[in-house]
Structure formats: C-alpha cells, structure tokens
Amino acid sequence: MPTTLAVVRLDRDLPLPSRAHDGDAGVDLYSAQDVELAPGQRALVPTGIAVAIPHGMVGLIHPRSGLAARVGLSIVNSPGTVDAGYRGEIKVSLINLDPAAPIAIRRGDRIAQLLVQRVELPELVEVTSFDEAGLADTTRGDGGHGSSGGHASL
C-alpha cells in the first residue's frame, strides 16, 4: 500500500505540490507571495500549504537545482526539516547567493522541493564512554572537519 501525504491547501489559488516527472523524489513547492531578494538577502517565504508527515517519516525541504545553478537561489538551512508533528504552513528560508544581482520571486513560482523519507527514531542511551558501552574504536576516531583531506588548499 503506497504511503499517502495529507496536504491542506491554505491558499486555494496555488497548485498542489507536484512532481515534474514520474519517479521524481521531490514535489515542487510554490511561493505564496512576491519576494525580491537583494544579493545576500534572506527571506522566509510561505508556500500556502500545510502537510501531515506520517510518524516515522520526515519532510526535507531542498533547493531546486536549476534555480541554484542559474541564479544562485538556495535555502539557508538546507535541507529544512519538517517533523511529523508539525501541522503549520510550510515556509522556506530562501537566500540569494548571487554577489551582484537581485532575484525576483513571483507568487506561484516553484521555489523548493519537498522530499518525504523514512527516519530512524532511536532511543537515546547515555554512556560514560564508548569503550564502556562495548563500542569498538574506529579508524576515524574523533577526526572531524577536514580530517580526511582531499582538497589542494588544505
């Protein structure tokens, strides 16, 4: 049985989210208002919809790759997270990454895409050390940001 996603259209004049092509992972989200973003400017843009993400799943708001490549429009907290318990309007925190040109977004423009994925919800267990918890050392250990190298400037 396929998973369904309940969608409330808060703005009846905007289309329901939809996939551009059969098999696409994400559904397009539309801007519910006109917005002009100056270079480097951010705006929280409403989409005119609310969704009920099923328990055990998460909604992830991703940039549209064409907009990112063509005009530098992206999402500040990419991907944005829509938790299963959230029932309010989906809003997208957009940013203009172009250093010189403003970006004009018109009501009804496709601005982002929503992916719904299963998510593990592990029980958190406090331990005093990973050794005590019986978890083996790894080759990475506590090597964090930049620890794997791989860039000429590092």
From Swiss-Prot:
GO terms for biological process: dUMP biosynthetic process; dUTP catabolic process. Disulfide bonds: none annotated. Residues 135-154 are annotated as: Disordered. It is an enzyme of class 3 (hydrolase). Keywords: Hydrolase, Magnesium, Metal-binding, Nucleotide metabolism. Transmembrane segments: none annotated. Its cofactor is Mg(2+). Its EC number is 3.6.1.23. It catalyses: dUTP + H2O = dUMP + diphosphate + H(+). GO terms for molecular function: dUTP diphosphatase activity; magnesium ion binding. Substrate binds at R64, S65, G66, N77, T81, V82, D83, K91. It holds the Pfam family dUTPase. Pathway: Pyrimidine metabolism; dUMP biosynthesis; dUMP from dCTP (dUTP route): step 2/2. Residues 144-154 have a biased composition (Gly residues). Belongs to the dUTPase family. Homotrimer. This enzyme is involved in nucleotide metabolism: it produces dUMP, the immediate precursor of thymidine nucleotides and it decreases the intracellular concentration of dUTP so that uracil cannot be incorporated into DNA. Each trimer binds three substrate molecules. The ligands are bound between subunits, and for each substrate molecule, residues from adjacent subunits contribute to the binding interactions. This is Deoxyuridine 5'-triphosphate nucleotidohydrolase. The gene is dut.
